[in-house]
Amino acid sequence: MKKWRINRPDPVKTAEFMNKCDLKSLTLDVMTSRGLTDFDSLADFFKGEELSDPFLIKDMAIAAEVINKAVDQYDLICIYGDYDCDGVTSTTILYNYLESMGANIMYYIPEREAGYGMNMEAIEMLAEKGVKLIVTVDNGISAVEEAERIAELDMELVITDHHQPPEKLPRARAIVNPHRADCPSSYKDLAGVGVAFKLCAALDGGSYDTVMEQYADICAIGTVADVVPLTGENRTIVKRGLEYLANTEILGLNYLIDKAKLDRNALDSTGIAFRIAPVINASGRFGSPLTAVKTLLSEDPEDAENYVDTLLNLNTQRKQTETEIMTEIVNHINAHPETLDHRVLVLSGKGWHHGVIGIVSSRILEFYGKPNVIISIDDDGNARGSARSVKGFNIFKCFQHCGELLDKFGGHECAGGLSLKAENIEKLTQMVYEYSDPMEKFPSVELIADKLLMPQDINLDNVKGLAAMEPFGAENPAPVFAMLGVRVDKIIPLSQGKHTKIEFSYGSYRGQALIFSLAPEKACFAVGDKLDMLVELGINVFNNRESISIRVIDHRLSGVKQERYFAAKDCYEKLMRGEQLPASFIRKIIPTRQELIGVYKYISAVKNITLDNLFMKISGDSMNYCKLHICVDIFRDKGLIEFRPATMKISYVVPKQKVNLEDSETLVKLNEMLGKAGN
């Protein structure tokens, strides 16, 4: 179960804004719920921010001058990119622009195995090729040693980047990065491709007219893919880019849009994030990032289609590899359930593809709601890890705590990476536990609803009005609404039982909602039950007729008290870690015989159920999550059920003989703890 937070709009401000603009009340409720209570700021958000003068970014004028001089002299220029979607799109834009200027131009992107950023081997190779000027895109801000070598080899260097600068900047003719402390540009949140886009505008004399028409579509893809805030200038870039993307002249993008079965009349940032960007990223994860660049640059239809097919195949491999790693993790957790008792998960495996461990880490965070470090071990005993966390637990500081074991690490509060010797993984795991387990309060993944949706809010005009907030993305997510006390009238299986549709009543409103990836027989509800749901609203069009679509993001039976759930879950994990708790508490969570009988009877009746669903069905004042989990552990100890901790699935097992629950490992352990606590 995930934690919910339901925000409240400001009804006074909503009413005030409705008198000043033609936005719908539901849209204004969302905006005021997100803290936008000043009308000028509201107007700026929907009007879109004009792109500021590219020359406001520190060193932009110098960069343009150096590059223009190299173009005029026909010096060999190399664009040095990065292997992710942001780096690929940055490379594509700048290469295409300089080629159109008649430059003597090439590009270089390191393979993932070489690591992020500049490397000495590549620099030596570029010098041998006769490169006179290196222009980095989406990297370079930390390349202090590499920059010195470039100077020694009598090459010039222009750095364009958007990552946080170190204290010491590299030696370069120009360093174009909005995050420089001395950069006067007011907008700081550009992706690497946004910086490259502005460099092209600077090379064009400062005008955005040509570069917007030629590159806004590619720039939008890189911006969405890099998950930078879709506010301010980024919002403007993506909005314009989506307009151009529908009729793009880039052959590779046209094939990709068609093969991904995207509707050209309804292209949005979600389509980029889930259908286009992952395919481009797959080339850097499993093949060569050069394939993605060639896809975007190719002017030959046959070549472009072949490149797209290659990318799609690589993306299929990526998905398969993710699934294989997830299966290994599930098997490990089922064999070692104590893994889940810790506040931060550390999981490692030999041969796990390091190109996907970041994605796996994100999936683990979403599923278990816990910060985690996923580590891949190679044949030489070297290990590389990727981590994801939640706001409130700084994974970078955790890495600092473990720094003595790490060869290299970096990141920020919610994400990071590391490398170490495989022999140190066990020590690292213990140090992570020592750092995180004792924390008094620990954050959890939280789903945020913009408002409690009332029946009268649900109408076509209101739902259609939400489109004004697009494009959605980081810091401007698609609106999410809470619906509390929804009565289930009918349950309908979809796609051979893979998904579920419900017909429901919500006050005076009668509607349908879709719950993806939930088989009806695995639902926590039945006809007649009341549900609380978090939903996204949209518009379906069929035979030119519009209707409201409701997609359920999360749901639970009405009446569940989430604070009690999470407090009891935390206590259970403390117990399993062996932390000493008061004797009075331990007594309360040891189930009575009658409580054990009641839980067992329910399980034997339903046969298969998840622990969370069981909690929602039978929890009460005396049966909290901690006590319920202990009941399940007791039954598992005695072979009365099969319990798979990785998925929390409980399956009834027909007993072969009578068992004595009193001598179960779990009860023995609890009684020992009770004795130590001073019975």
Model-found features: residue ranges?
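Intrinsically disordered, low-complexity regulatory tails of plant transcription factors
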Residues: 143-144, 226
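Acidic, two-metal ion nucleic-acid-processing modules in DNA metabolism proteins
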Residues: 94, 99, 235-332, 388-395, ...
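Short, glycine/acidic-enriched loop or turn micro-motifs at the edges of active sites
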Residues: 85, 141, 164-165, 180, ...
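Short gly/pro/ser/thr-enriched loop/turn and capping motifs at secondary-structure boundaries
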Residues: 114-115, 143, 163-168, 182-184, ...
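Generic beta-sheet signal
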Residues: 108, 137, 160-162, 176-178, ...
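Acidic-glycine-rich active-site phosphate/pyrophosphate-binding loop
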Residues: 164-177, 504-509
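Short alpha-helices
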Residues: 93, 170-224, 593-595, 599
